[in-house]
Amino acid sequence: MQVILLERVAKLGQMGDVVDVKPGFARNYLLPQGKAQTASDANIAAFEAQKAQLEARNLETKKEAEALGEKLGGQQFVVIRSASDGGNLYGSVTTRDAADVATEEGFSVDRKQVIIREPIKTLGLHIAEVHLHPEVMVTIELNVARSPEEAELQASGKSIQELAAEEEAAAEFEISELFDDIGGAASDDEGDAPAAAADEEESK
């Protein structure tokens, strides 16, 4: 099926190109999203008549996307999720999740603009792409953690393994301190016993 592109489409072509695509791809994606029209003589003629207007509109939306991209690109967003002690999520972080946290922070992002190359199924820092325009793409960082405190530690560069090791070391230190306190108290009791016995003998 032949269509004429109304904007640049990755791996297909530039605005105004007539390209061959699968009918399903055209009907389910290109046509309903206004990215292309069927390449009939009437549509091609209409495009040529509106080409200058379409190019101007595309340039305007590109500038808007670039302005947003300068603010959005490189931002880190916290996603709170339940996970096992080993850091495996009970579920996964989706493009909708990424769009939602960005929107909550004041950025207008739709889940259809987000691409996550590898499924996010573990705690930690993960990269997502945000395609703001056919020619404008930025990356954001998703800080997936079990709590805001954990997210803050991860943001400082500590991995889940390092955090777990620190927690284990802290727990072992507390146990060691507890045993030291118990041992010290026992020694004091043993030291007091002879003195008490001596006092008792003197009083007789």
Curated annotation (Swiss-Prot):
Keywords: Ribonucleoprotein, Ribosomal protein, RNA-binding, rRNA-binding
Gene Ontology MF term list: rRNA binding; structural constituent of ribosome
Biased composition (Acidic residues): 187-204
Entry-linked Pfam families: Ribosomal_L9_C (PF03948), Ribosomal_L9_N (PF01281)
Any GO BP annotation: translation
Keyword 4Fe-4S: no
Keyword Isomerase: no
GO cellular component, one term: ribosome
Region span, Disordered: 180-204
Protein family per UniProt: Belongs to the bacterial ribosomal protein bL9 family.
Function text: Binds to the 23S rRNA.
Protein's UniProt name: Large ribosomal subunit protein bL9
Source organism per UniProt: Ruegeria sp. (strain TM1040)
